[in-house]
Amino acid sequence: MSKLLSSLLLGLVCVAAFGQRITHDFENVPLSEAIKYIQESTNRYSIIFIYNELEDFPVTISLQDEPVTDALEHVIGFYPVSMKVENGKIFIECTHKTARHLSGKVLDENGDPLAFADVAVYSADDGNAGGNGAMTGSGVTNESGIFVIPIEANRNRVEVSFIGYKKCSRYVTGEDAGTLQMQVEALAIDGAVVKGERPAYKMAKGGFSVDVQHTMLSQVGSAVDVLGQMPRVRVNGSGEITVASKGSPLIYINNRKMNDANELNRLKSEQIKSVEVITNPGAEYDATIGAVIKIRTMRNTDEGISIRNDANVNYRIDNNFGGSEELNLSWRKGKLELINDASWTRHVMGEDNKGSLEYVYMTEQKVKDEMTADNIDENFAMDYAINDSCSVGAKYNFMKRTKGDIKLDGSYSVYKDGKMLGNISQNWQNEYLAGPSHQADVYYVGKMGKMGVDFNGSYMFTKNTEESAVRETSEELKDQTVTSASVMRGQLYAAKLVLSYPLWKGSLNFGSEYSNTKTDGSYKNEENIIEASEYKIEEGNMAGFGEYALSLGKWNANAGLRYEHVKSDYFAFGVRQDDASRKYDDLFPSISVSRQFGKWDLQLSMNRKTRRPSYHQLRNNLQYDNRYAYEGGNPQLRPQITTSVDFYAVRGWLTFSSGYSHYKDPIMFITKQYNDTVALVTFDNIRENDRLYSSVTASPDLGIYKPLFEIDYEQQFIDGKQLGVTHRLNNPSFAFIVNNRFRLSQSFSGSVDLYACTDSDGGFSHDKGYFSASAWIRKSFFDDRLSLRLSANDIFRSEKERWIRFGNGIVSTKDCYNYTQRVSFTVTYMFNYRSRKYKGTGAGNAEKRRL
């Protein structure tokens, strides 16, 4: 196996020709330091410059996969600095040889940095009160709103202009112009209102990037609320996040894999710099990943202690309260930063459900249930910057569910051949506890000479236990009690190494990843109505990957290849099950090509991915629903293989995407025959199916009104005859989204969000359409140190789950309201607060999600 991996990686090194590219975040560093970093990342060019004369020009910019020359042009920006490329050498020098520079910062009407504003400097040494002296210099602000302009005179007049804003000017003595804040001025031209704005969307490799920092998205609440505003991203009433046509995404926060969904609630929108949605992940990502979301936060380099406290209470329409309390403490001194985040959360969920199941017997059921879960989380992280290009760190997470009560009361009627046999009352008491779970991560990011090194190691342990007692009473049919207990444990060791090295005219990126997972579980039923079960799964995954990027003028291309060897052994009661054990050797290619046509960015991409069944889906135990219906896993499941082609077009605040996916051995949720009287809800593979999808999003900036409009189309093409499903489920579906966002001032904003969808077909289910509305307002005080947020979800109580599911001679229905109507109030207080930035990415991330 090791020889095969070595041969693969050697082949990747030998055959790849890579376009050298730079990816790095510069946070208020001198231009000379930025150029020095780029020089150390290339062996194609020699960069010649005088270090001292460029020290006065600060640089704040995020470079993402850019060629060396483009990267240099972007860090230089509009500073008075020239660049010349000649015979493999790049000459950079300041065009104004003066020891004095006038610097300042420009903000927009909301107090955010204003990039690309024109700055002119006029001499005022002549004492002209009108300020009409000769213009002695000019420049443009960078992404941080900062300008630096060489000057000769001691007293000057600074004038700032930007389309859509009133001109702003002031007299300055010395070299510090301070902060200048612009005021909006809408210009009427032939009846049209023209206002300056930033591009809302940008093309990214395999997807698109959305600016959060400079938009009102920074005020919507938590990271969950931000993701709910992203094109193609869906957040349901339970907080579950999916990407249209791609499933559940892998989410990274500052390149670190998110494993606890509560992190998104703890991360606040004002901490977020940008969000990148990748619908065609490259070879670096596990082959099971269909979509990736990358969240980048802002970083403050101030030293000392910072504190943030968030208190939330929410009221559900059925008279239940939930809430959370979170305290974040961080301390920074020199190169060391320590972070501690502790939280307590109470989740309150429930449903009012009507359902039916038609098999040998027909049942009509009415159920009301509620769940209360109390979780405690403790997170500790450490980062140490060895130098500007090397850092190490570690992170530990502890989680335990201290309370997990589910209470259900209901009844169901039983029919056969149209004749009612009786009524059964059902009471269900369930205790579901999670944890304690432990996760530890370590990382190293740095350089060894010109080779970039990114190493991550992870350990994870999880435990879930469940005890339930179901009591059924009936006058016509016999009484029955089912008591059960189950437990599931999981343990993971993982490591990932990514190396990058300048090679010929490009940069070679390659690496390997290894994970070892052990899970076991058992189920016992005292009355022996359902057979006891016990299973263990041992799985190892070894992967090697390589990726390159090539830039040819306005064209950009990326290609990658990932090889995975997976060996899985399945045991039942200690005996290896040969028919359920698996071994796979697969190649997963990915490629994307993009080009800029004027203001349009176009991209076409293709990849091959897999979806391995989760350990929950592979379990061999059953769950008792009622005496005519069980739920369970399927140890015989095979991995699903997906081949996708996606097209993106981006221009400013407008995006369009369209794609096609082919699924081989797709994993389906289906109802099957368990025995002569009982139906089993489980999972199975079918031969293949296909899916088409498209999305159009517009997010214009109309002054205080900043709406988002989105229309989505999706249609599956499926044949379920092999599993006995003859119903046609190939109808198209549409979703319509209107988020009416407004920002009255820097401290006051809000939104009314509307969502509607038509009937849709997914797998073997026909889902009914619905409409929902939600709203929120936010007000901050004391320079944003204190903020209040009030929100209302599902205002008209119309977000219902209604479907018809078809099986092999079995039809089931559900008409359910999940009590998503609720009101929430959050108070946040910050003292010297800065956002966290643990730099590790984690290892074995797909396995963590399966656990």
Identify what each model region corresponds to:
Residues 90-95, 175-183, 191, 223-226, ...:
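N-terminal periplasmic accessory domains that precede
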Residues 148-150, 223, 229, 256-282, ...:
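Short acidic/polar hinge/loop motifs at secondary-structure boundaries
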Residues 429-431, 435, 536-539, 579-582, ...:
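Outer-membrane beta-barrel signature, preferentially recognizing the C-terminal barrel domain
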Residues 463, 565-570, 598-645, 659-676, ...:
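Surface-exposed extracellular loop regions of Gram-negative outer-membrane beta-barrel proteins
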Residues 492-496, 541-543, 638, 644, ...:
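Outer membrane beta-barrel strand-and-loop segments of large Gram-negative receptors
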